[in-house]
């Protein structure tokens, strides 16, 4: 057999009382894997049983090891009746199948019951012995690593980035089977949890097979989603970017590659910049001095068609992005054609990554998105999901054609989402059209002289802003100006992207969170009529969301959006649209023009006075925002030395649309951006409401900043420990006043209150920045709106933020260490012997900085100690892909968990707030326990992808489904690394320090 699974049940603690007569429990354990079940002996009359069982051995195929979860069921023995279930534990075996990962899973796992929640803990030890299998027709993909992070993982080197992989599996939902009418809610929930866990494992295995066919060994930017289609079935789908990664193991290569962004952000990388308000976008990418290789498509057979891209391009060390010279050079055109042909040989040239090494992106065209409304049908054959595959293939093909229309051959920052209500499903996909770096192809057609000629052009840090399309045949109306940095190429007046801010971008001032929120009523209908009504509403919602984003961006005095995420949610009688992004001022783009209001009735004196009053308020708001975010761009003058400025009246013919005359000539000049060209015309009540919503947008309190990207542009010096907050709010709408205006107000209040609750809890951390603010909205029932938000607050040194020159590492770097624990909003309570019964304070926003249920003794047999100074391992959780003040030394595998919680005593458990708070706390406790059992001490790239709440107040019932994922890692603090490095020989210390300084 290719694999042997060994399980040992050690002990239990804090079990619930199951025998009312003795106030004790007669507990035993069932261990099940596949169709094989083992049982322990019954431990009589104890709430802390000590089974210390023998090793239970399962001889299984490696395919089953990937698909099946290990099920551990704790029961109470009853002599004369059926045994009572206490709870279950599902353990994913996949992290043990990596050659570099943990060798054993050992620790205390919370025993979870879908009705009662966590009911004690159980100590389990799991081992796997794998045999070499050289069968070329095998159906397993053991050894393929999965990463949730949307950047190349720390401590790894990207050899080849192959491209897009996708897969989906379908099945019937146990909640809607006929047997569900006669079985208990607990049995139904457990059947659903087990099926989802099984489908998740099967999905990872199938994607791993595609990666192996592409000669890769990892999937980065792995995004898995569950589509609960009701009676139609259950769909689990995933997308990712296939890569070939190499582990950096030597100390000389490892230390600079794993530098925490906290260290790199605390310096301003561009010390030659004369503008004091100009900062780098963030840390230098850890892969700056590494080799990336994109190989043209290889000729090998494929067993099945997959949507992937196998391109191979290798930027050399130190090459910046951008077209530093003229765009139309014959050599660059030749290389661009070669890269484009290599990309076009694959079906979908998509990348789920959002952060890239310098030089990877040559041009960014803008956001491309596509959507479709589908009518769900029953899944007749779970083994043949052609219908859903065809739906997504249509969406991806449209995305590809839109990118091509923008003059781009790839899509980066790609993501997919769905929204389902009854029989209607909205499929959405979005990404950023881009041109990837065509230099240094490995096909042998590029000679050294060409490379040397290309290397003569120095990077300008503005190339990704230059338009990739032909300005004489633009795909859409746009205002173009010459780049404010190089003065050679054309740039748009505004730039929208779904990726993180490139590391080599030049930003003026600070960034901020910008949101567009919209609600629209729709008539309640069924089947095709409902789908038609939604299809008719969608274009208008998308247009209004885009208009809101544009208006708010100009109101902030900024000219670019990064990390754009648009979510369209459908309910029974309404549609909701939410767009979140981080606004910045790019130095290469023109200064945004103001917002001018125009009315339809110029003869009305009072109306004109009202218009002028609003115009004054808008102008004052723009001025205040520029002062708040320190946006002070330098004046453009022709006396700047070394910057050739083109003629201000250079002729440029722009074809704005098919209906306009081709003889129209638009003259562009550098002062174009300073004109008030953006006009808001007030011609009805809705337009007036839009203007009022702009002016009533609540700014963050003094000392607070927020963004939805990992790094706040313009802030480079983090000083605090890592924390994460999660908030869930549910509001019930009144059916009496359901109008568009009332819906919009309620939706705005929901989002604002989520942010205000975080600001209030973090008021002692000022100055504070909320990073990676992630919003999710849903309409679980007819008159219920639900909002979920997660954020990672971080302190920064305001005095150092005002420094304008690069300072030495010793002066500018303030490492996050245990000395900063007084900055934690909730201090850690370390307890190794007992698991806290109430692991979170009674607040609606949940902090995850709590003690792990596993002590330090459970970190044995690991390659690296997680925390040398602490006596108890505290499992940290963060939505960021890094940990400030620390270096990630090892990735232990992906954490992907799905939980269901149901109650029939909602009021007794504290109502909706108490029920949701307790459930989220239990989810965090179970995630931390699984990570600690693997030997990890942190979860990075954490995301709560689904939180579906349903209630029946009349029956005092409620149900909630939560899906979370992240990367389990081992990290070591930089202070600990310094102690280790100081004990090394002097020569090694000097060499490592030199390389570290070069990296930062």
Swiss-Prot record:
Top-level taxon in the UniProt lineage: Eukaryota
Binding site for Ca(2+) 2: 19, 76, 78, 84
Cellular compartment(s): Cytoplasmic vesicle membrane; Cytoplasm, Cell cortex; Cell membrane; Cell projection, Ruffle
Pfam families linked to this entry: C2 (PF00168), YbjQ_2 (PF23025), YbjQ_3 (PF23028)
Cofactor binding comment, as recorded: Binds 3 Ca(2+) ions per C2 domain.
Phosphothreonine: residues bearing it: 317, 601, 666, 807
Domain C2: 1-109
Entry keyword annotation includes Phosphoprotein: yes
Modified residues (Phosphoserine): 197, 200, 260, 293, 295, 304-306, 323, 643, 657, 659, 661-662, 671, 817, 852
Family annotation (SMART domains): C2
UniProt entry tagged with the keyword Iron-sulfur: no
CC per GO annotation: cell cortex; cytoplasmic vesicle membrane; plasma membrane; ruffle membrane
Alphabetized GO MF terms: calcium ion binding; calcium-dependent phospholipid binding
Comp. bias intervals (Gly residues): 319-328
Binding site for Ca(2+) 1: 19, 26, 76, 78
BP GO annotations: insulin receptor signaling pathway; intracellular protein transmembrane transport; positive regulation of D-glucose transmembrane transport; positive regulation of protein targeting to membrane; positive regulation of vesicle fusion; protein localization to plasma membrane
This protein's UniProt keywords: Calcium, Cell membrane, Cell projection, Cytoplasm, Cytoplasmic vesicle, Lipid-binding, Membrane, Metal-binding, Phosphoprotein, Protein transport, Transport
Record's comment describing the protein's domains: The C2 domain binds to calcium and membrane lipids.
Function field: Required for insulin-stimulated glucose transport and glucose transporter SLC2A4/GLUT4 translocation from intracellular glucose storage vesicle (GSV) to the plasma membrane (PM) in adipocytes. Binds phospholipid membranes in a calcium-dependent manner and is necessary for the optimal membrane fusion between SLC2A4/GLUT4 GSV and the PM.
Name of the protein described by the UniProt record: C2 domain-containing protein 5
Organism: Pongo abelii (Sumatran orangutan)
Lineage: Eukaryota, Metazoa, Chordata, Craniata, Vertebrata
